[in-house]
């Protein structure tokens, strides 16, 4: 009887912990979508410029999102698998916004490239209704990249993050003489501007899954592309592995660059940083809210990475009392 009670308690606890975690990659199929097409597909509002250029996805399977789907730029870089009633489907990346009156004001509307539209129906039809879609990871190669906007200087710069399999939730920066990361605000054109510049600074890129990639940049240089040290996970099962990937910070030597991607954009050679930090996967976020801490999953110990910070975790404080309450209730029921 006691064994059954303990097993039941553990099962309930596991269910509660799993239910409390919202997987950002679990997306349901949305019906009732529509699509049109347009031809001026380069230089969209999401900042990718030429689709086959150094910042673009490398193909023409793209979409301009209706105003409600676009979410003021938050969905830039998200990939969607769109299907029609005849089981034809196409996967597109959001690279632009569609704000025209009419179709673009619908809740779930895509203004597709001609190539993408033609997979779902003839262009002569003009408008396709009765479509469905689901959010999917983007099929990109290599690691996440970051570029500083043209016009960046010692008083202002703006970051463009691209080549990510999932969308970016937050970009934060701190100067070398600071211990505090400052979150930046995303613009409607998918850049992350800041006036915190001057000297070497560190950039922290957070995915929608709660992972972090760190980049150390020596100085402000317009249109310089940096390839980071990692790529984000695309499923919650990957995030919950016993030994999650550690994305170490990268330091770039601005004097050493690889072949130019174009006359304005260069990809520098990476040099490992002597000071490594770990990302905190999403399943740890319910335990730790501070980026300078990491939860040791197997040993269940708190590892302090910054002695100047204090942990405030309501979940850890309340969990023992909650478990004790459940145990008392079940013991009363069984005995």
UniProtKB/Swiss-Prot annotation:
Subcellular location(s) per record: Membrane
Statement: the UniProt record of this protein carries the keyword Iron: no
Name of the featured protein: Expansin-like protein 3
A Gene Ontology biological process term: slug development involved in sorocarp development
Lineage summary: Eukaryota, Amoebozoa, Evosea, Eumycetozoa, Dictyostelia
Positions of region (Disordered): 247-276
Top-level taxon of origin: Eukaryota
Family as reported in the entry's similarity comment: Belongs to the expansin family. Expansin A subfamily.
Main localization, broad class: membrane
Regions of this protein lying in the Extracellular compartment: 21-314
GO molecular function, one term: cellulose binding
Source species of the chain: Dictyostelium discoideum (Social amoeba)
Residues bearing glycans: 87
Composition skew (Low complexity), residue ranges: 249-272
Cellular component GO terms held in the UniProt record: membrane
Expansin-like EG45 domain: residues covered: 43-143
């Amino acid at each position: 009887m006691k064994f059954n009670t303990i097993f039941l308690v553990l099962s309930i606890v596991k269910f509660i912990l799993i239910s409390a975690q919202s997987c950002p990659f679990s997306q349901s199929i949305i019906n009732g979508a529509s699509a049109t097409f347009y031809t001026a597909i380069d230089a969209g509002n999401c900042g990718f410029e030429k689709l086959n250029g150094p910042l673009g996805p490398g193909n023409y399977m793209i979409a301009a999102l209706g105003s409600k789907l676009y979410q003021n730029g938050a969905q830039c870089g998200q990939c969607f698998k769109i299907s029609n009633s005849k089981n034809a489907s196409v996967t597109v990346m959001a690279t632009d916004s569609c704000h025209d009156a009419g179709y673009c004001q619908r809740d779930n509307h895509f203004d597709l490239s001609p190539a993408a539209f033609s997979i779902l129906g003839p262009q002569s039809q003009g408008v396709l209704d009765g479509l469905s879609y689901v959010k999917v990871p983007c099929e990109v190669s290599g690691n996440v990249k970051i570029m500083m906007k043209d016009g960046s200087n010692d008083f202002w710069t703006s970051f463009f993050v691209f080549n990510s399999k999932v969308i970016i939730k937050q970009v934060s920066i701190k100067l070398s003489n600071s211990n505090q990361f400052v979150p930046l605000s995303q613009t409607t054109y998918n850049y992350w501007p800041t006036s915190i510049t001057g000297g070497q600074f560190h950039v922290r890129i957070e995915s929608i899954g709660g992972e972090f990639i760190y980049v150390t940049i020596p100085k402000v240089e317009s249109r310089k592309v940096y390839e980071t040290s990692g790529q984000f996970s695309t499923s919650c099962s990957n995030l919950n592995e016993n030994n999650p990937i550690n994305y170490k910070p990268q330091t770039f030597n601005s004097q050493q660059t690889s072949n130019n991607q174009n006359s304005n954009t260069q990809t520098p050679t990476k040099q490992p940083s002597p000071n490594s930090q770990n990302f905190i996967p999403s399943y740890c976020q319910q335990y730790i809210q501070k980026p300078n801490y990491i939860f040791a999953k197997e040993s269940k110990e708190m590892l302090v990475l910054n002695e100047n910070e204090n942990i405030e975790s309501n979940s850890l404080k309340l969990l023992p009392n909650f478990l004790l309450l459940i145990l008392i209730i079940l013991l009363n029921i069984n005995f």
